[in-house]
Every structure is written in C-alpha cells, then in structure tokens.
C-alpha cells in the first residue's frame, strides 16, 4: 500500500488535531475542520489504510484514531514544517542572552528556563564537559617578586588564568622553560588522557622546579574543572505532569524517579552528543524504558568546532514537534554564541 498525497494530508490532520486536543480524531472531525475536499466516508477508508500501514491506531475506548510512533516519525521526517517564533518570543530569547552574564552556570540556567517557558515541556541542559577539552597553550609570566600568572588556553577557546606564588629566585627564563615543557607534553591532550607516565616525564625534565610544577599542575586541573562537571539543569518538571498523558499516578512516579537520577539523564543526553544538529527520539526509540511514553528532542551546543554539551526537551509523544524543534535550534545557536563570548573573554 502506498503513502499518497491524500493519505499524507489525512495523517497530517490527525496529528495536528491530536497534538492540539489530546482527543482521538474521527473522520467527521477531519472533514469539518480541515476542508480536504473529500467525504467523511472517503476519509474513513483512507484512515483504515493508514491504520493497516501502522501510522495510526485505535485506543480501546474510542471510535477515533491517534497517531502511532511510526506516524509521528513519518510526520517529523516528511511532513513537518518548522513553526515561526513570534517577534515577542525572539525578543525574549535575545534579551535573555544579551544581559551581562559572565557565569557559565547562569547562562545554562537561563537557557533551561527559556526552553521550558517557550515549549511548556521539561527542559534539560547539560553542563559543559571541560574534561573533554584539550590543552592548547600554557604560559607562565613573572609579574613581580614572588608573583607569577599562569595562563591556560583550551582548544575550545576558553582561557583560564590564576596568580601563583613562586620563589624569589625564579626568573622569566625559568618560567619559559617550564611553559615550554608543559606545552610539549600536554598540547592536544585532554585531562582524561594524561597518564601517570607523562606526568613522571614532566617532573623528570623539570626536577629542579618541582615546587612550582606541583602548584602549576594543581592550578591547571582546578581551573579547568572548577565548573561543576556533568551537572544537569532541569526546568519545567511540572510542565510535563500537566499533560493529560501523565495523570496516571504510577506513570508520574516512574518519570519523576528518572528525573531525579542525574547520571541517567547524563547518559541519555550523552547518547546524542557526537551528532551535530537536532536529534528526535520518539516513544520506543528511546533506549530507557521509563521514557518510552515520551519524546525527546536534543541539540548540541559548541564553541568553534568543539561540542561542549547537549540541551533537550522532554515531552509526551503528542509533543508539538514543529515548535519544539524551532525553539531548541534557536536556543542552541544562541547558547553557543554566548558561551563563545564568555569563555574567550575570561582573561
């Protein structure tokens, strides 16, 4: 059986109506509201074909039909047109990022709040994983007697700096030697792939500067992971519970239990981390059984070409995909630009 234009129109009408009303859709409703130019009897026949093809299904207690996960997937891949944000909504987003915020955590918090507000679902925002960023350049500069500044540049463009106390006998030539060895050994390496043997090599080559090296390596690690690692910001938890699909107490308990498990949420978001653009998981496409009654739309955010983390929206499979995709795409682009400004302006 072939998915022709008329079947597409009827499937689109069923999905739009069900997203808006959460009520099963009958042939008369489609005929009355969507003006497809065919009789209710013809619509019924086409709906019967769509059901046989697996795109719609009949709830036990209703004469109407609702989209299946396969139907939603066909809609997202073939029929969906992104929704335009209103001018007021675009201004809200722009102002949310234009306000002078220098803390990464506050920017991510705002991102979550705006996503939850604009979609009316639950928003998840993953803290950047700086452990996965690589060292690009290390420089130590003598600032005065017993004072030096340590500057660390990461491949994301993030710049970290820290004052440190050094022996009075230390010269800029000594600091240049330390910087040169650190760059030779650490450049292009992330914190997670720096092995003990490499640290031993560094100490061997800089044995007469051991005390400075102890402090420098400690500060380098502290500055890079000073932001809470792998934290997940959740906003709008109760938004999803307001959906009629989640009026069942047991269903609510299962979902709330999942949302309390930060490690599990991190794993869910990490699954799409290496994919640029927007990822949509519908119903049982989600690997976790607890959210197989839900859909998840995610997008990565980045600085330059380095992916730092993931943002996502969790809602029922009856999600307004056209709106959510528009919102999350807009937010990921704005978040990337804002983090680029913050991270590169930390000197």
From Swiss-Prot:
The keyword Lyase does not apply. GO terms for molecular function: DNA binding. Keywords: Repressor, Stress response, Transcription, Transcription regulation. It comes from the Bacteria. The keyword Repressor applies. Belongs to the HrcA family. NCBIfam families: hrcA. This is Heat-inducible transcription repressor HrcA. It comes from Desulforamulus reducens (strain ATCC BAA-1160 / DSM 100696 / MI-1) (Desulfotomaculum reducens). The lineage of its organism: Bacteria, Bacillati, Bacillota, Clostridia, Eubacteriales.
